[in-house]
């Protein structure tokens, strides 16, 4: 099995990033068979689809790399690298744009969500970035791609592109990847102030999220003030229906402690959230405090972060080279 996945270097990482992607990667790495390979990359080319500050982007790349390592990604067991350091990503993306169909991209719901009412002002990169995502995984002959529900459509696009290319040029060049979806009860962590909105760094209220750099005291304050409702904890998951804030806190506790929604409710049903929140705070502090300390250490050694990313890029290029060389040969191109 070869797993490939990327994350944009956004900076200001929060609990949603940790539970939604990073810890899933760590579990996959730690549970891997000896023959499995895992490639995790910082998707800095994807970050260019919106306006960027180059200096901030460079800082965010190091920050994200440090956070991944602090969370448990081991560069000796997984290949960790910066997307733009492997030029084959961009090369293959252009090749695949010539295979992908406009109708396929027009159906991508994330472009509609991200461009909003300003579709005419959105960049071409934002429209076409699912093709770059396809290149990211097809380049390495990925067999499995861990994605959230909101990204499943893009993996289906990658499969369609791989199948069309293989069929058009009578080749078996590209492995058709399988999506690996889910994994954890809090894959979608919601805002602490609005249970219907995802936890996000773009929310103007810092009280809406748990940052990975938050102190123990800040975590306690945010959970204490997190929005809930006056009803007690139910005994069954169905009792959380129509209670998004309650469901969010229960889901976070389950994910952080390795339990399930059912087990959390079995232990805490009948309690008010005033009694439940201290337990949630303790669980979050136990998870984040050691990660935060390790992150601070890594921040102080930028040269080591750069070395790890460079070594990872060297390994990634070795795996990428056969695919791009064969793609050019099949197309009649010279490289």
Regions found by a protein language model. Name each.
Residues 60, 88, 153-154, 245:
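An acidic site on a long C-lobe helix of protein kinase domains
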Residues 116-165, 169, 191:
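Internal, conserved structured core segments that host functional sites
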Residues 2-135, 283, 296:
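N-terminal Rossmann-like or analogous alpha/beta NTP/dinucleotide-binding catalytic cores
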Residues 10, 142, 205-207:
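Short, solvent-exposed beta-strand edge segments and adjacent coil->beta transition regions
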Residues 65, 72, 100-103, 142, ...:
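A generic secondary-structure signal for well-formed alpha-helical elements
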Residues 102-106, 139-146, 254-264, 292:
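Short helix-capping/linker segments at secondary-structure and domain boundaries
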Residues 15, 153, 159-335:
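Conserved nucleotide- and phosphate/pyrophosphate-binding catalytic cores
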